[in-house]
């Protein structure tokens, strides 16, 4: 029997995600059980990389290195946007505390040609703060933080999703290290000396001296 356009699209998305998983040390996924040879309609996507979160009782913004998003490809997909639900703590202007994800213009004007692997690329860029919008936030506190903070360099993870293709995937030894899931993003210590020479910024180190009137710079 000839497959419907939707089934063909679901099958194409599944193959694209399998290929993406081969090309990325960041992404993995699980699928809901399917009947017979039907392609998956529901995914639990796991991203392993640096993102940010903040506990409700704390003012500290923390690093988190594992993120899970559920993606449900409803009956109207790909004509309509998939249902997205964030399942792990995250601190981002465009993701609400309850896990609702804002994709900007895609939320009101969904593009059926946007494939599932491309959507995962967008989600990864949100996690690492390469992509965020502070003007129409779902999390106002995160938007205010993103606009005013100067302590954290963004994006917090420089790797593209297809990091194996880009040649920046971690080595086996690095990958074996336990993930850092809650490291306080504290303000860095005040730099010793910062010289500005034209457009070039040069860091210098202050070396202690027994004479308080003398400051050595290396």
Residue ranges and their predicted role:
Residues 1-65, 76-218:
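UBC/E2-like fold recognition across ubiquitin and ubiquitin-like conjugation systems
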């Amino acid at each position: 029997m000839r497959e419907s356009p939707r089934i063909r699209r679901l099958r194409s998305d599944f193959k694209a995600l399998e290929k993406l998983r081969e090309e990325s040390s960041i992404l993995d996924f699980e699928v809901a059980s399917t009947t017979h040879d039907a392609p998956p309609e529901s995914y639990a996507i796991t991203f392993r990389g640096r993102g940010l979160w903040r506990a409700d009782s704390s003012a500290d913004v923390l690093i988190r290195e594992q993120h899970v998003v559920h993606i449900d490809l409803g009956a109207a997909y790909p004509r309509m946007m998939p249902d997205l639900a964030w399942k792990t703590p995250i601190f981002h202007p465009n993701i609400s505390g309850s896990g609702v994800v804002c994709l900007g213009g895609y939320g009101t004007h969904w593009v059926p040609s946007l494939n599932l692997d491309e959507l995962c690329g967008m989600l990864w860029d949100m996690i690492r703060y390469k992509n965020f919008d502070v003007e129409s936030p779902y999390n106002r506190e995160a938007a205010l933080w993103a606009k005013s903070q100067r302590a954290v360099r963004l994006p917090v993870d420089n790797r593209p999703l297809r990091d194996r293709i880009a040649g920046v995937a971690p080595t086996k030894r690095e990958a074996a290290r336990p993930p850092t899931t809650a490291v306080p993003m504290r303000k860095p210590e005040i730099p010793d000396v910062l010289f500005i020479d034209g457009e070039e910024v040069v860091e210098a180190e202050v070396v202690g001296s027994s004479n308080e009137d003398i400051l050595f710079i290396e």
